[in-house]
Amino acid sequence: MIELKHVTFGYNKKQMVLQDINITIPDGENVGILGESGCGKSTLASLVLGLFKPVKGEIYLSDNAVLPIFQHPLTSFNPDWTIETSLKEALYYYRGLTDNTAQDQLLIQHLSTFELNAQLLTKLPSEVSGGELQRFNVMRSLLAQPRVLICDEITSNLDVIAEQNVINILKAQTITNLNHFIVISHDLSVLQRLVNRIIVLKDGMIVDDFTIEELFNVDRHSYTKELVQAFSY
């Protein structure tokens, strides 16, 4: 379970980015955080990951095995390491897997799942496309077997086929390994396919919180309706 109680945060004392955030996410629930750029979505993710401490309030995680997948994969990889080295480092660090043959077998399995060519393993991050690197980024996090996954705009560099592939993989992971994941996105179609609950942020505050089945209810907040209408165009 993840619980945020009256969480307030700002990068300086004069302006708070998030104000009085209250969220409870039970195990097995996948949640989307929706809102415009600058509303505090990524800051909220950073707080859950423990990268920042709230100015006020408390954050409780029942499981410490929480990992992120960030929007810009190039900054997530060591530029001097091959893709293979980065992936195997995750297997060693998070799972204690040192046997090279076992590592290779896991990589081969995941390459097939993510529809990636094994020849890319010898490349540096700068030598593969943005879409390929983002899929490797997702793969690396899943190889570490986290219980909770924080996904920040992870489909932004993917074409529609690769996007659906990643979505299918993440959904399958909730059945096997993940307790749940939190998806930060401005793309409503991604959230509709991935999560069963959406929390809407506006100006650092929660203005709406509903299940995916309630998305088009007439009692949705006016800002939620604006986002839905904008996306429909």
From Swiss-Prot:
CDD domains recorded: ABC_NikE_OppD_transporters
Catalyzed chemical reaction(s): Ni(2+)(out) + ATP + H2O = Ni(2+)(in) + ADP + phosphate + H(+)
EC class (word): translocase
GO cellular component: plasma membrane
Gene3D superfamilies assigned to the protein according to its UniProt record, in alphabetical order: P-loop containing nucleotide triphosphate hydrolases
Molecular-function GO terms, alphabetical: ABC-type nickel transporter activity; ATP binding; ATP hydrolysis activity
PANTHER family according to UniProt: TRANSPORT ATP-BINDING PROTEIN
Family statement drawn from the similarity comment of this UniProt entry: Belongs to the ABC transporter superfamily.
Entry protein name: Nickel import system ATP-binding protein NikE
The species this protein was found in: Staphylococcus aureus (strain bovine RF122 / ET3-1)
Classification of source organism: Bacteria, Bacillati, Bacillota, Bacilli, Bacillales
Gene (UniProt): nikE
